[in-house]
């Protein structure tokens, strides 16, 4: 069976995701579509608005298989996020990887990837890296004549292409043009499509504007309890105050003494937003700081990075998805696909189990990695 992977967050699932999944499967002529989905925390440095089990149920409206992107990668910047997703796609023996972009032109991505390979070897690139500038910022400064880097989705798409070239050259990348709404639009202004940001805003404001841009079949899942980043504040504050600077310095993505700034400002902060205002500097992007704070909350350390992919957690599957897994196991019997976490395999998903515990502590929910079996449709 031919398969296409989609790297997703589905935070939450909406019509744009359905369109992407359908188009990806059709254009690549695939038999199976696989969502490699972030768990309970997402790339922007936030808890997902719904837990991973609810979002997996939503996803099965469009795909045949939902697997979990490891938690460490889910709260990482584009390069590591993409690398891990591509390695999982390769582990799942996929033929294609499809991503949404404003460009919609695969040749543009392939050409720019080739140019960046050369740029990264230049002394100027290395000099800017030593200055502490973020990778996206360096590229935007050195590549001024290419609009491809002007949007987050295009930049992430480029990371997928480069990760495929490095770690899984047998996978064919493909891009689908994003429809209508921009990634960070704050308001729902279209009758069929809207950004995840605007949908989350609608939910937080307790309006029902989201109903027009979400498949009717999953409206029931939207009625479930949801959380926001502000809900993490008291737990985050405790996590920071219970450590000293030496301990905080070991947190994943902590650098250049920012742990001291965090300790100096945390007692003044009255909310997550207030803390972000106190911490914001020209040196670091808003998202970088937000991710860093989630790493503190989750207690992810620099040495916790998984060495390789040696198992994949299956969150949900259709009958066709189950058939596909059986096909892979027949060809690669050593590969480990886990549909139920238990005492025997829990050591393979330490970070994910911990992230779920923290998410449940914040949200008051009880669905965890041990008591929630694989979702089947």
UniProtKB/Swiss-Prot annotation:
Catalytic activity, as annotated: cytidine(34) in elongator tRNA(Met) + acetate + ATP = N(4)-acetylcytidine(34) in elongator tRNA(Met) + AMP + diphosphate
Entry's EC annotation: 6.3.4.-
GO CC annotation terms, alphabetical: cytoplasm
Subcellular location: Cytoplasm
Enzyme class: ligase
Superkingdom to which the source organism belongs: Bacteria
Keywords: ATP-binding, Cytoplasm, Ligase, Nucleotide-binding, RNA-binding, tRNA processing, tRNA-binding
Residues binding ATP, per UniProt: 7-20, 100, 153, 178
GO biological process terms held by the UniProt record: tRNA modification
GO terms of molecular function: ATP binding; ligase activity, forming carbon-nitrogen bonds; tRNA binding
InterPro entries: Rossmann-like_a/b/a_fold, tRNA(Met)_cyd_acetate_ligase
HAMAP family: TmcAL
PANTHER family membership: TRNA(MET) CYTIDINE ACETATE LIGASE
Described function: Catalyzes the formation of N(4)-acetylcytidine (ac(4)C) at the wobble position of elongator tRNA(Met), using acetate and ATP as substrates. First activates an acetate ion to form acetyladenylate (Ac-AMP) and then transfers the acetyl group to tRNA to form ac(4)C34.
Family statement: Belongs to the TmcAL family.
Record protein name field: tRNA(Met) cytidine acetate ligase
Organism annotation: Staphylococcus saprophyticus subsp. saprophyticus (strain ATCC 15305 / DSM 20229 / NCIMB 8711 / NCTC 7292 / S-41)
Organism taxonomic ancestry: Bacteria, Bacillati, Bacillota, Bacilli, Bacillales
């Amino acid at each position: 069976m031919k398969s296409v992977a989609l790297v997703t967050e589905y935070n939450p699932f909406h019509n744009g995701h359905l369109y992407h999944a359908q188009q990806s499967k059709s254009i690549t002529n695939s038999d199976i579509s696989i969502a490699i989905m972030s768990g309970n925390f997402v790339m922007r440095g936030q808890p997902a608005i719904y837990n991973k089990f609810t979002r997996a149920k939503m996803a099965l409206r469009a795909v045949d298989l939902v697997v979990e992107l490891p938690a460490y990668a889910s709260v990482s910047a584009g390069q590591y996020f993409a690398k891990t997703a591509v390695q999982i796609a390769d582990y799942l023996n996929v033929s294609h990887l499809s991503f949404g972009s404003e460009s919609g032109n695969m040749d543009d991505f392939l050409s720019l990837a080739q140019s960046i390979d050369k740029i990264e070897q230049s002394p100027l690139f290395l000099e800017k890296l030593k200055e502490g500038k973020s990778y996206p910022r360096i590229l935007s400064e050195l590549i001024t004549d290419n609009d491809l880097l002007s949007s987050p989705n295009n930049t992430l798409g480029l990371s997928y292409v480069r990760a495929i070239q490095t770690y899984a050259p047998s996978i064919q990348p493909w891009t689908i043009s994003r429809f209508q709404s921009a990634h960070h639009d704050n308001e729902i202004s279209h009758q069929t499509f809207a950004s995840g940001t605007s949908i989350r805003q609608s939910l937080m404001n307790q309006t029902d504007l989201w109903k027009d841009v979400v498949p009717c079949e999953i409206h029931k899942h939207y009625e479930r309890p949801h959380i926001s980043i502000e809900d993490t504040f008291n737990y985050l504050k405790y996590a920071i105050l219970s450590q000293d600077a030496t301990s905080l310095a070991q947190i994943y993505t902590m650098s250049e003494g920012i742990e001291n700034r965090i300790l100096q400002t945390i007692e003044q902060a009255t909310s997550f937003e207030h803390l972000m205002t106190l911490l914001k500097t020209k040196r670091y992007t808003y998202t970088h700081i937000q991710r860093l704070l989630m790493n503190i909350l989750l207690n992810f350390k620099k040495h916790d990075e998984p060495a390789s992919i040696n198992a994949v957690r299956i969150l949900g599957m259709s009958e066709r998805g189950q058939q596909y897994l059986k096909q892979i196991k027949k060809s690669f019997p050593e590969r480990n696909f886990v549909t139920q976490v238990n005492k025997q395999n829990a050591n393979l998903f330490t970070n994910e189990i911990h992230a779920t515990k923290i998410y449940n502590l914040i949200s008051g929910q009880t669905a965890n990695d041990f008591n929630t079996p694989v979702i089947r449709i």
